[in-house]
């Protein structure tokens, strides 16, 4: 059936986010099919850096300045350096309409992003960011134009034909994501060792959390890829939808290598061809102790783990093992 092309691919059963403040986060997703770590990591990284919307300054007007190659008396930085500093102001703004914000300050002192007077729906996220430095007696007034957008827009595209004299266009860095890196490692799922583990590190400007940024990027990819799906989702047959009534505890379908056992105990079970918990609990203590390299310490460890699950050695399971044990294990894996 065609749905097996995607339904039988393994999906991550572990997706963990670790945040460090509002600007940094790390995502760990595992297991993934071999090669999917690189595929998803690269796709998410590209979308995170290029396609998420944010706010940025698009133009600035400085009193007494006609163009960006000017200098201002009493201001240590020239206008070109001031414009470069303005590009780095991190802004969060609601709505799509263009907004204005103003800063006016007298020297001596440092003009920072926190000195900017904003309207209610604009928030400065890096108020300590330095814009320029004023000497004694110097004064500066700047008016900024702020817009929402995505990606990077060069200053030339922000220059309008009807712009007043002295309005200096600014390169706009709209993306709220500043850095993204990822790595792919091998990970284990059951007895298979060659699945992928994807780790992504993301740094934002604070207007969006790392976790939300990844969620938005994934949604963009989902929407873009949906246009290539040229068929309706096949309906599952009734017998596939019906859940088999088990005659035993679903926990018996869990594989013993998923238990938190010592290496010695796990190897002994593997060498004795004990794959599922259902295989294990039917063994008696005497049978276990006859297993090569299996001692009293390993026995006590296994008894303790089974007891935590309400199980013990020497149990009888008349219908064990079921004929379709692998299918049942997949079907009931979310119940143990």
Curated annotation (Swiss-Prot):
Top EC class of this enzyme: transferase
Entry's Gene Ontology BP terms: DNA-templated transcription
GO CC annotation terms, alphabetical: cytoplasm; DNA-directed RNA polymerase complex
SMART domains: RPOLD
One annotated GO molecular function: DNA-directed RNA polymerase activity
Reactions the enzyme catalyzes: RNA(n) + a ribonucleoside 5'-triphosphate = RNA(n+1) + diphosphate
CDD domains per the UniProt record, alphabetical: RNAP_alpha_NTD
Domain notes: The N-terminal domain is essential for RNAP assembly and basal transcription, whereas the C-terminal domain is involved in interaction with transcriptional regulators and with upstream promoter elements.
Protein family: Belongs to the RNA polymerase alpha chain family.
Name of the protein in its database record: DNA-directed RNA polymerase subunit alpha
Species of origin: Sinorhizobium fredii (strain NBRC 101917 / NGR234)
Gene: rpoA
């Amino acid at each position: 059936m065609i749905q097996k092309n995607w339904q039988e691919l393994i999906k991550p059963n572990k997706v963990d986010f670790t945040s460090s403040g509002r600007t940094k986060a790390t995502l760990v997703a595992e297991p993934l099919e071999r090669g999917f770590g690189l595929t998803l990591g690269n796709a998410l990284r590209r979308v995170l850096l290029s396609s998420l919307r944010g706010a940025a300054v698009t133009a600035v007007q400085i009193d007494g300045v006609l163009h960006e190659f000017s200098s201002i008396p009493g201001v240590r930085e020239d206008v070109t350096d001031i414009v470069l500093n303005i590009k780095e102001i991190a802004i969060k703004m609601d709505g799509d309409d263009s907004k204005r914000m103003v800063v006016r300050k007298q020297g001596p002192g440092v003009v920072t992003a926190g000195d900017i007077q904003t309207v209610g729906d604009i928030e400065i996220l890096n108020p300590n960011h330095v814009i320029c430095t004023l000497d004694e007696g110097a004064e500066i007034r700047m008016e900024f134009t702020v817009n929402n957008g995505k990606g990077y827009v060069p200053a030339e595209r922000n220059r309008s034909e009807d712009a007043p004299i002295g309005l200096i266009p600014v390169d706009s860095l709209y993306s709220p994501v500043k850095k993204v890196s990822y790595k792919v490692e091998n990970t284990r799922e059951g007895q298979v060792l060659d699945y992928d583990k994807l780790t992504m590190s993301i740094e934002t400007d604070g207007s969006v959390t790392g976790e939300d940024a990844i969620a938005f990027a994934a949604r963009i990819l989902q929407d873009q890829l949906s246009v290539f799906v040229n068929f309706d989702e096949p309906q599952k047959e009734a017998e596939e939808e019906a859940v088999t009534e088990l005659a035993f505890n679903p926990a018996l379908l869990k594989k013993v290598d998923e238990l938190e056992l010592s290496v010695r105990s796990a190897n002994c079970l593997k060498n004795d061809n004990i794959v599922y918990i259902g295989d294990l609990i039917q063994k008696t203590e005497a049978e276990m102790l006859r297993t090569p390299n299996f001692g009293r310490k390993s026995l006590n460890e296994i008894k303790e783990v089974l007891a935590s699950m309400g199980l013990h050695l020497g149990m009888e399971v008349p219908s064990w093992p079921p004929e379709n044990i692998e299918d049942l294990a997949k079907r009931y894996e979310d119940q143990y």
